[in-house]
Every structure is written in structure tokens, then in C-alpha cells.
Regions:
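Face-selective signature of the C-terminal outer-membrane beta-barrel domain
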Residues: 32-55, 71-260
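Transmembrane beta-strands of outer-membrane beta-barrel pores
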Residues: 5-11, 50-56, 102-108, 191-197, ...
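Membrane-embedded beta-barrel scaffold of Gram-negative outer-membrane proteins
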Residues: 99-101, 294, 319, 326-447
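Structural signature of Gram-negative outer-membrane beta-barrels, strongest in the C-terminal barrel
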Residues: 219-368, 372-377
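Repeated loop/turn-to-beta-strand initiation elements of outer-membrane beta-barrel proteins
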Residues: 2, 34-46, 56, 89-96, ...
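Hydrophobic, lipid-facing positions within transmembrane beta-strands of outer-membrane proteins
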Residues: 1, 7, 22-28, 76-82, ...
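Gram-negative outer-membrane beta-barrel transporters
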Residues: 238-240, 394-579
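C-terminal beta-signal and adjacent terminal beta-strands/loops
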Residues: 286, 378-380, 395, 555-642, ...
């Protein structure tokens, strides 16, 4: 049995300890081997572990923030695990393994904020569809729409997050020889569950709480994941070397009660081959002490996330009425609340990642070298797309208040929850109630659904690791590792977009056009990047004082990126313009070959009343030629114009560096203490961007300086 205790403290601001992370952890482990009695011929190894920690992040001592504000987040957890390994040594099974684990966390966070408003502030909490007018909070049930009186106030918001994860796995191994070849077969299954016992966002001060909707994590269903796999591992002698072949197949299944997708399932195959040309045995004095080559291919299927399978509800809040302000400086807003959620897509395909890799591993005079080239292609990558539903709602303007006989201070406003009609009554009862005139507005309402990107995403690169032979006189090891990486992504889906927050030109009516864009409503629909990074790690052991000192230098030698705007054939989607004030002053210049202002048009558009797609550019030119200013301005809102000349310029960022440092000291056999500091030299150097032709701080590319101390006690 072993016991250990650990204390960790990490501070992110060296000038003031106002933001710090602290954690106390204790662990207990038990291991036993049963090899007598009924287990004499088939020994059973049993292990049990229990770990718990208390701690979290706190900003309670910040002297520079607004007085009285603070935030803190708990990091409390308890984890348990067990393992049974039964060596059966039967002709049909070699050993059987059973593993299980449980992890429960308390990650509740709290934040106290300062707020102020010159007039009353409208707050929304409603989750049911309908029309609601703001009322003051008077305790008890929270109104769908309420207001906080003008002034200043503090509020504490909390998020109760208590996830529980359980896992159980069973694996059987069978090892046997086929001639001189060693064949190992592995069959296994695993099951895991995820659920949450927290209540989500809440406030004990609802009279001053900001806009939020109750979403109780504890009411969500449990996510069950079950998997099964089989793997065959064959080791075949080949001359002085050997060939290792591994083939495997895995099935994953996810089930969430109440999900429209029901049971989701997938199959993921893989194959590895390794040829050890020169094995390590007997070559300790040779120049090349080991040499092997390897290759692998596999396909990993990613099932949809919980958020896709059981989406969180969202809400669209439309202000449909604003009253006059009375002598107490209070006005009343009415809102139309539309609950929305990510919709079910019966045509959704599972995302697949196809991986290919070749590598070489060698040992030359004690220097271990590994070189790997890889290519990954992601198919059917997940994305959230949108389409627009045609909706109507009742809107009441403030024009109807001008001729109202009821004095402003005596007006009591009410709205019908289903029709949206606003009625004004007299608080004193002297004057009759009046119904305000209203209009029916037509508007597009966005709906979101999980979708697949039709164009694959390609990643490829080279990785290397060199572990130099140990410098015995200094007890020092040096490692150099790095990578060259290339990435290209191009969105080719035809997507809808409408600026629903805007108004139609020349009116106060909702905007009523939809644009259709290849890859989305932006200048670009993709990007490409190339990076070259390398790291040097030096680790020195000082046995006499039982100390380990480690320093790591991280370097970015190449960082290239470029924004893309093109279709599947390579034709450019964005257009260069000669005059930034005229989006129709099109030129024939390439967006990549010159520095110019650019504009992106939708391919087609449609209206609320007519869903037939129409050519956008032709309609824009016709509206300008005919002098239809309102239509021109409406169409203009669907175009995206750059305000800089370098939108599609190549961006090379100059090299930058960061250093990390750590020291670990053993104190007897009972304790160890570690100090670490990331970005140890607090690199604030300026780096150059060829795209913007400006210098910028390296702080946006490397981690902030932070340091910490860890104390471990072992029993």
C-alpha cells in the first residue's frame, strides 16, 4: 500500500498574487498478487486506487479591479479505479483483464460583478414561447421578462457543474505461436457513462441577476458509450530482423435517451506494419545499433457530440414594444420570445479521419532518431449550418402612445401572451383602457442544424525526435524534437445568411432578403497554413543531492498563413474593386496577385415572399441602373467589403521563442518539491507580420509567464 500527498500553487501574476490556482491532493493505492491456493496455477493481480483533491482558482485579492468584484472556481474531485489481471495460461486464452474507474468533480464557479444603468434595465429569463412585458421582481417565481431599477448594483452569478464519469472495460488476450511467428490476439469491450448532477447557472440574488435561462444539467439524460474491438498482432522473424503486423477493428456506439438520433454506431479499422532491419540485441558496439521502418493506415470515426445529439435550447428575443418613460425614469419593454434549438438532420454523416503514416527509427552511436511523415484527411467534418424560417410577429410602435389620454405616470401596460396586443389601463381607474395599434411584421428566423462539410480537410507534415546519447560526465540528456506541418481547409457548402438584426432600407420593417454563399458569408471561405517548430530540452540529474534540473527552449522558425476565397475549381470568389466607396467598381485583378480592396457577393439571393434564387450581381447592377435606392441598399447589406488592402496577402510571422524551466528535489524518501516556470524569461519581443507590415508583441503567440510550486509527500 502506498500513500502520497501533494500541494500545488500556481500564480499567473508576479506583480500581485490576485490570480492564483491552489490544489491539495492525496492519493492511496493498494496492490496485491494472489498466487496461492486456488490461484496457485492462475495468479491474480489486483490493484485499487483512490485520489482526491481540493482547490481551485481565485481572484479575491485583486487590488486593481473594481472594488468588491471577485471570481473563484472550485477544482474538487474524487477518483477511484481498480484493476484485475488474471493470468489463466489456457490453450484458448492467456490472460483476462478487468478495469474500472469513477471520477466525480465539483467545478462550481462564482463571480461577483459590478453593474450600473442610468435607467431601468430589462432582463430576460423566459423559456416559453410568447409575448411578455417587463415587470419588477418581487420574490417567488421569476418573471419571464423583468427589470432592474436604474442605479448601480452588485450580483453574484454561479454555475454548478458536477460531472460524473464511470468506465468499465474487459479485455482478453491470447498469445500463441504459429511456427516461428508469435501471434497475439486481443478482444475487448468497454463501456462508459457521462452525466452531470449540477444545476447549471443560477443566482441567489435574482433581483439583480443578468439575463440567463435556467438549464439544469441534472435533468439531462446520461450519455452511454459502448465499444468493442479486436486486434491481431503477428511478429514474424525475417533473417536477423523481424516483421510486426497489427490489424484491428473497433466499433463505437453512443446512446442518449430522448435523442432524435437514437443509437449512433461506427466502425474504425487500422493496420500497422513495422520491419526491424537491425534489432538492438548484440549491436551495442556497432555504429548503427538499431534500424527499423514502419507504416500505418487507419480510419477513425468521430461520432457526434452530446451537444449535437441532445442540443441545448436557445432563445431568440425580439423587442416588440417600448413604453414611454414615467417620472420615476422607468419604461417598460415587451419581448417576443422564440425558443430555438439545433434541429435534427436525418442526412447527417459521421465524421471520418483517414490517417497514413510512414516512419524510420534508428540508433546511431547511442543517439536515438525517429522520423515520421504523416498525412491526414478529414471527411464529412461536422459544422453547424443555418436556414431561415419565415415567421411573423406583432409589433407595436411608440407612435400609438402620442394620443393616449392616460397620463404617463398612471399607465399600466399589459401584453397578450399569444397575440402580442398591448393594452394600456389607467392605474386610477378614471379612464378606460385602450388597445394600442399594432402591425404584423414578416421576418426570417434563423434555425441551426448539424451538417457536414462537403470538402475534405487535408493535413500533412513531418515530425522528428532526436535523443542524444547521455553525457555521462555531466549526467545530462539532450532532446531535440520538432515538426513541419501544413494545413488547408476550403468550405464549399452553399450556405444561407440574412442580417436579421437589420432593417429594410427606408423603413423600420425587418430585413427580408437571404443571400446564398459558397463557404459562408465572409470575404474568405478557407485558409492554408504552414509551420516549422523545434524544441530543445536539456535535463540534468544531480544524484548527490537528488535533484533534476530541466530547461526547454521552444522555437517557432516558420509561421505562414493565407486567407483563401475560391470554389472547387480554383476560381476566385472575392473580387477586387478600384474604389472602396463603390462595390461595383470591379477590376480584373487577382485577389492573390495584388493589394486591393475586395468585395464578396453572394452567388444568389431570394426574398421573404419569393424563395426562388436570383442572380445577385445582376440584380445589384439593375437596381443601381434603375435608381431603386432601397433595393440597392438592401442588396448592398449582403455584400462584404474589406477595409484594408492586405486581406489576401501572404502572412509570414518572424521567428519567436519561449523558455520553460523546472527543478525537482527529492527530500529523503518521503517528499519531493518541484518548482516550474513557463516563459521563464518573460519574452516580450516584437515579431514582424509580413501581411500587415507591422510589429506586434509575441505575447499573443506564446504562453503568459506563470510559475508554481508542487510539494509531494509519499508514505
Amino acid at each position: 500500500m502506498n500513500t502520497s500527498a501533494e500541494y500545488t500553487e500556481s500564480i499567473s501574476q508576479q506583480m500581485s498574487p490576485y490570480s492564483a490556482y491552489r490544489r491539495e491532493q492525496m492519493s492511496l493505492s493498494y496492490l496485491n498478487l494472489f498466487n496461492s491456493g486456488i490461484f496457485a496455477a492462475t495468479p491474480l493481480r489486483f490493484s485499487l486506487g483512490l485520489t482526491g483533491n481540493l482547490g481551485g482558482m481565485s481572484t479575491t485579492a485583486d487590488p486593481d479591479a473594481v472594488q468588491g468584484t471577485w471570481s473563484k472556481a472550485a477544482d474538487n474531485a474524487i477518483r477511484a479505479n481498480f484493476s484485475l489481471n488474471w493470468l489463466l495460461s489456457k490453450p484458448w486464452i492467456t490472460n483476462l483483464e478487468l478495469n474500472g474507474s469513477l471520477s466525480y468533480s465539483d467545478k462550481e464557479s462564482e463571480e461577483r460583478t459590478f453593474n450600473s444603468s442610468a435607467i431601468n434595465k430589462t432582463i430576460l429569463h423566459g423559456r416559453e414561447a410568447g409575448y411578455y412585458i417587463a415587470v419588477p421582481y418581487s420574490g417567488g417565481d421569476v418573471p419571464p421578462v423583468m427589470y432592474i431599477p436604474g442605479g448601480y448594483w452588485y450580483n453574484i452569478m454561479s454555475d454548478d457543474d458536477r460531472p460524473l464519469t464511470t468506465k468499465l472495460s474487459l479485455k482478453a488476450n491470447h498469445s500463441h505461436f504459429i511456427g516461428k511467428a508469435n501471434n497475439k490476439i486481443k478482444i475487448g469491450a468497454d463501456w462508459s457513462t457521462d452525466r452531470n448532477f449540477g444545476i447549471g447557472a443560477y443566482s441567489t440574488e435574482m433581483e439583480t441577476a443578468p439575463t440567463f435561462r435556467e438549464y439544469r444539467y441534472c435533468d439531462l439524460p446520461t450519455m452511454h458509450n459502448a465499444g468493442a474491438y479486436i486486434e491481431d498482432n503477428v511478429m514474424i522473424p525475417a533473417g536477423k530482423g523481424r516483421i510486426n503486423l497489427i490489424a484491428g477493428l473497433r466499433s463505437d456506439n453512443t446512446l442518449i435517451k430522448g435523442s432524435d438520433y437514437g443509437l449512433t454506431s461506427s466502425l474504425s479499422p487500422r493496420f500497422n506494419a513495422k520491419y526491424t532491419i537491425l534489432p538492438r540485441q548484440g549491436r551495442e558496439r556497432k555504429t548503427v545499433r538499431e534500424l527499423s521502418v514502419r507504416a500505418s493506415w487507419g480510419e477513425a470515426v468521430k461520432l457526434p457530440s452530446f451537444a449535437m445529439l441532445f442540443p441545448m435550447p436557445t432563445y431568440r428575443d425580439i423587442r416588440v414594444f417600448t413604453s414611454t418613460t414615467n417620472s420615476s425614469n422607468i419604461s417598460y419593454d415587451a419581448y417576443y420570445i422564440q425558443p430555438r434549438s439545433v434541429q435534427y438532420n436525418p442526412d447527417l454523416k459521421w465524421q471520418r479521419n483517414r490517417m497514413m503514416e510512414i516512419g524510420l527509427e534508428t540508433n546511431i552511436l547511442g543517439n536515438k532518431i525517429s522520423l515520421t511523415a504523416f498525412r491526414n484527411r478529414t471527411l464529412n467534418s461536422y459544422r453547424i449550418s443555418s436556414h431561415y424560417d419565415r415567421t411573423t410577429y406583432s409589433y407595436t410602435s411608440d407612435a400609438g402612445l402620442a394620443n393616449l389620454a392616460i397620463p404617463a405616470d398612471d399607465r399600466v401596460f399589459a401584453v397578450d401572451a399569444s397575440s402580442g396586443i398591448v393594452t394600456v389601463s389607467d392605474r386610477t381607474g378614471k379612464l378606460p383602457s385602450e388597445v394600442l395599434p399594432h402591425e404584423t411584421y414578416k421576418e426570417f428566423a434563423p434555425s441551426y442544424y448539424p451538417d457536414n462539410e462537403i470538402n475534405p480537410i487535408d493535413r500533412y507534415g513531418i515530425e522528428w525526435v532526436v535523443d542524444f546519447a547521455k553525457i555521462k560526465a555531466l549526467q545530462t540528456e539532450v532532446r531535440v524534437d520538432g515538426s513541419w506541418y501544413s494545413y488547408k481547409s476550403l468550405g464549399l457548402n452553399l450556405l444561407e445568411y440574412s442580417p436579421v438584426a437589420s432593417h429594410a432600407a427606408g423603413t423600420n420593417l425587418p430585413y427580408n432578403l437571404i443571400g446564398h454563399y459558397i463557404g459562408g458569408n465572409a470575404y474568405s471561405n478557407g485558409s492554408e497554413t504552414k509551420t516549422l517548430r523545434t524544441n530543445i530540452t536539456i535535463t540534468t540529474h544531480i544524484p548527490k543531492v537528488r535533484m533534476i534540473v530541466s530547461a526547454k527552449l521552444e522555437a517557432s522558425l516558420l509561421k505562414y498563413s493565407r486567407t483563401l476565397s475560391e470554389d472547387a475549381s480554383g476560381a476566385e470568389l472575392a473580387r477586387t474593386i478600384n474604389d472602396i466607396s463603390d462595390i461595383l467598381s470591379l477590376s480584373n485583378k487577382s485577389i492573390y496577385a495584388t493589394d486591393s480592396y475586395v468585395v464578396r457577393f453572394p452567388e444568389t439571393y431570394c426574398t421573404y415572399d419569393d424563395p426562388t434564387p436570383r442572380n445577385y450581381l445582376s440584380a445589384l447592377e439593375a437596381a443601381k441602373a434603375s435608381g431603386d435606392i432601397n433595393l440597392y441598399n438592401d442588396l448592398w447589406q449582403l455584400a462584404y467589403k474589406s477595409n484594408v488592402l492586405y486581406t489576401f496577402r501572404k502572412d509570414y510571422v518572424s521567428p519567436y521563442f519561449s523558455a520553460n524551466f523546472s527543478v525537482t528535489k527529492e527530500i529523503g524518501d518521503l517528499a519531493s518539491i518541484s518548482f516550474y516556470a513557463n516563459n521563464f524569461f518573460v519574452n516580450r519581443a516584437q515579431i514582424w507580420s509580413s501581411k500587415t507590415e507591422t510589429y506586434m508583441t509575441a505575447a499573443s503567440y506564446i504562453p503568459r509567464f506563470y510559475y508554481g510550486l508542487t510539494l509531494r509527500l509519499k508514505f
